[in-house]
């Protein structure tokens, strides 16, 4: 599929749909396996490839956010254990960048989940985490809906 070797019996439109759907699902499955194998770096790569193949699946954005959140938590612990100074300041900067990444992935997950009824329950759960992080980072929820709307498919934008 990655090599784009279309079977001779398949027309271009069918192949494009097949490739998009199945390549994304394959990478998503491999990402889940990597997560279960406690290999978040490999999982991240797989979920990024799944998003590249099909950018509308909220599950991939959720997992990317979950992985980024794990990285953020490690940085926060290091920050809390560090002494005042440049290293601590650098850790705070890194943590802020990481939480922004988590917020971005979760906003994408919520936006995509709202576009597909089968993912509405998942979207509501992710939204709760998103709101917590967004409020912590921005001191309010002002601007959150605009961020989510930015990632909604064109047909769902208000």
Can you say where each PLM-predicted feature lies in the sequence?
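Short coil/linker segments at helix-helix boundaries
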Residues: 2-21, 70-108, 112
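Terminal, low-structured helical/coil segments at or just beyond the last alpha-helical repeat
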Residues: 6-12, 86-89, 93-96, 108-158
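Residue-level recognition of tetratricopeptide repeat
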Residues: 23, 56-60, 116
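Short coil/turn linking the two alpha-helices of tandem helical-hairpin repeats
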Residues: 32-38, 65, 70-81, 94, ...
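Alpha-helical solenoid repeat scaffolds, predominantly canonical TPR units
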Residues: 34, 46-47, 98, 105
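Canonical positions in the second alpha-helix
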Residues: 49-50, 109
